[in-house]
Amino acid sequence: MLTAEDKKLIQQAWEKAASHQEEFGAEALTRMFTTYPQTKTYFPHFDLSPGSDQVRGHGKKVLGALGNAVKNVDNLSQAMSELSNLHAYNLRVDPVNFKLLSQCIQVVLAAHLGKDYTPEVHAAFDKFLSAVSAVLAEKYR
C-alpha cells in the first residue's frame, strides 16, 4: 500500500519525467527488448530497432498510461481497467512482462533523474509500479 509520502514522492518525480514520455518510454521499451528478448513476441508487426517511430509511439503510450496512473493513484483499478482488459483478453500478454517493463522503467528514471531519484523515490516507485502491474494482471484471474 502506498503511503501519503510515497504518493508525494511519485508525483514529484513524475513531474520531472512527464515532459519526456516519448523519449523515456522508447528507452524503457528498447531496454526491455534487449534485456528480455522474449518480450519482442508481442510486437510482431513493429520495427523494434531503437528509436523507430513505432517504438517511440508505443513508448509514449506506455508512459502516458503511467502518467494517468500517477494522476489516479488512489483508484488504479478504475483508471487502468481498459488497459487491463486489452492486455488480458485481446493481447494476452503474460503478466510477468509488466514486471519486466517496470524494472526497465525504473532504470530509465534513475538514469535520467539522477540525484533526484533518491532511494526513497526508488522505493516509492517500486511499490507504485508493483501496484500498477497487479492492477493490469487483475483480469487474468
Swiss-Prot record:
Instruction: Give the keywords, sorted.
Output: Heme, Iron, Metal-binding, Oxygen transport, Transport
InterPro entries reported for this sequence: Globin, Globin-like_sf, Globin/Proto, Hemoglobin_a-typ, Hemoglobin_oxygen_transport, Hemoglobin_pi
Q: Please, which domain of life does this record's source organism belong to?
A: Eukaryota
The entry marks the following residues as binding heme b, namely H58, H87
GO CC, sorted alphabetically, is: blood microparticle; haptoglobin-hemoglobin complex; hemoglobin complex
Gene3D superfamilies, per database record = Globins
GO MF term list: haptoglobin binding; heme binding; iron ion binding; organic acid binding; oxygen binding; oxygen carrier activity; peroxidase activity
Record bears the keyword Cell cycle: no
Q: Does the keyword Iron apply?
A: yes
Q: Which Pfam families match?
A: Globin
Look up the record and give one Gene Ontology term from the biological process aspect.
hydrogen peroxide catabolic process
Residues forming the Globin domain are 1-141
Protein's job: Involved in oxygen transport from the lung to the various peripheral tissues.
What's this protein's family per the entry? Belongs to the globin family.
How is the subunit organization of this protein annotated in UniProt? Heterotetramer of two alpha-D chains and two beta chains.
Q: What name goes with this protein?
A: Hemoglobin subunit alpha-D
